[in-house]
Amino acid sequence: ESFGYMVGDFVRDKDAETSSLLAMNIAAEAKAKGSSFFKEMLKMYQEFGLYQEHLISVVKKGVSGAEEIAQMMKNLRENPVKTLVGEQVVRIEDYQTSVSRNLLTGEETKIDIPKSNVLIYYTDKGTKVAARPSGTEPKIKFYIGAKADNEAAAKDKVAALQADLEKLQ
């Protein structure tokens, strides 16, 4: 997916090569200390929580669809969401304006990467939702990241986020 993970900048492909190499490195280090990849993952879940991610693609065809998508992004910028699944939104990153705004303090910091029509909302409980129009298809994509103590709670939070996002459409 276009919202992938890159370990460094030495390989231009997201996800495939670098994430596989990172996973193999974790497994090798775990084995060297008498542990396993699985045990290390459980430790990370205990320390950092469990995350569940989901992609929602909303198709809006034709000229009117493109206008609807543009209006959705405009509304998200001009009337920011205050809560997601009952959690307070505490930070909004706007990659079109290159500004990250802390909603608790009002502090703004510069985002130092190329501009893009992307908004990311972060809550006080570690949930995040990113919105961006597709550059190649007539759709807007919402990337959901839910943090919880266990898998069932994370899945429930993703389902609740989906319901919240349907209200925005």
Regions found by a protein language model. Name each.
Residues 1-132, 139-143, 150-156, 162-169:
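Phosphate-binding and adjacent anionic-ligand microenvironments
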